[in-house]
């Protein structure tokens, strides 16, 4: 009977130790997996951030170039507009003078 009790206690102790070892191994594996996942997430985040920075810089460069080109085109258009305005006022002067002359002649006829 004493031998059975000792054997039962020894079996219970071995089971407890094995359970603790198994639990520690599972915990270690979970910790390692978590560390690997965290490292992978950090690497992916860093790569994404770097790609975003490069894309942002490229977009900014394209915007600046487009803005400069647009500004140049506006200046050219503005010059064209000034030339058009000058020619319009030059062309507009003759009809006004003609209308004034007609009004002067009509005024003289009324006298």
Curated annotation (Swiss-Prot):
Q: Which UniProt keywords apply?
A: Cell wall, Glycoprotein, GPI-anchor, Lipoprotein, Membrane, Secreted, Signal
Q: Which InterPro entries match?
A: Synuclein (IPR001058)
Q: What induces it?
A: Expressed under acidic conditions. Expression is positively regulated by HAP43 and NRG1, and repressed by RIM101. Expression is also controlled by SUR7.
Lipidated residues (GPI-anchor amidated serine): 81
Stretch forming the signal peptide:
1-19
GO CC entries:
extracellular region; side of membrane
Principal location listed in the UniProt entry: secreted
Subcellular location as annotated: Secreted, Cell wall; Membrane
Record PTM text: The GPI-anchor is attached to the protein in the endoplasmic reticulum and serves to target the protein to the cell surface. There, the glucosamine-inositol phospholipid moiety is cleaved off and the GPI-modified mannoprotein is covalently attached via its lipidless GPI glycan remnant to the 1,6-beta-glucan of the outer cell wall layer.
Point out the propeptide residues: 82-111
Q: Where is this region: Disordered?
A: 71-90
Residues forming coiled coils? none
Per the record, membrane topology reads: Lipid-anchor; GPI-anchor
Q: What does this protein do?
A: Probable cell wall protein required for filamentation at low pH.
Name it. Repressed By RIM101 protein 1
Source organism (scientific name): Candida albicans (strain SC5314 / ATCC MYA-2876)
Q: Which gene encodes it?
A: RBR1
